[in-house]
Regions:
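An anion/phosphate-binding loop that grips the pyrophosphate of nucleotide cofactors and donors
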Residues: 15
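Mid/C-terminal beta-alpha module of Rossmann-like enzyme folds, strongest
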Residues: 51-52, 126, 130-165
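Catalytic helix-loop patch of NAD(P)-dependent Rossmann-fold dehydrogenases
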Residues: 70-98, 129-130
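Conserved beta-loop-beta element that borders a ligand/cofactor-binding pocket
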Residues: 93-114
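Glycine/proline-rich active-site loop of Rossmann-fold NAD(P)-dependent oxidoreductases
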Residues: 98-99, 113-121, 150-159
């Protein structure tokens, strides 16, 4: 709603960047719609505030595991995360059409877990990073390092990227 956009604009006005890791909660029955409404409000609020830099932390589901095949569309993708992952993919598709913001979309690796902050990670783009035959992983602390690094030294403006240790 217009009021929702104004509230978000007021919250971020005067800041250099907005980082969104919005998720209404994996157990929310209408996660798909809630995710998209929330993401749209964050994008619109960021624009209304005049903040140009937006970094969205999305999901791994939209990473390409083969030409034309995204992880969320594979039979192995967990059913309990599917609606949220489909919404995150839809949000990425919206953001890709956004030309007034200096946006970046960060897809975490397939495995995101607790762990130590090492400050070390590898960068990827449209495909998940792997450790041999195993899916790549990263600690939440190192994912935060990657977010701050991208904000301080932008390398993926109007692009999606992924990371893993």
């Amino acid at each position: 709603s217009e009021m929702c956009i104004r509230d978000r604009a007021k919250a971020v006005a005067g800041h250099d960047a907005v980082v969104s890791a919005y998720n209404p909660g994996w157990t929310v029955p209408d996660i798909h719609d809630q995710f998209l409404k929330g993401t749209r409000a964050i994008i619109d609020g960021t624009k209304a505030a005049g903040v140009r830099r937006l970094l969205v932390v999305g999901g791994a589901g939209s990473l390409f595991v083969a030409p034309g095949v995204q992880l969320v569309d594979t039979p192995q993708f967990p059913a309990e995360w599917k609606q949220g992952a489909l919404a995150a993919r839809e949000a990425l598709n919206w953001i890709r059409t956004e030309n007034t913001l200096d946006w970046t979309f960060l897809s975490p690796p397939i495995l995101l877990q607790p762990g130590e902050r090492t400050g070390q990670y590898r960068l990827g783009d449209e495909a998940p990073l792997m450790n041999g035959e195993q899916p790549g992983s990263i600690s939440v602390a190192d994912l935060a390092v990657a977010i701050v690094d991208e904000l301080e030294t932008p390398r993926h403006v109007q692009k999606r990227f992924t990371v893993a240790n």
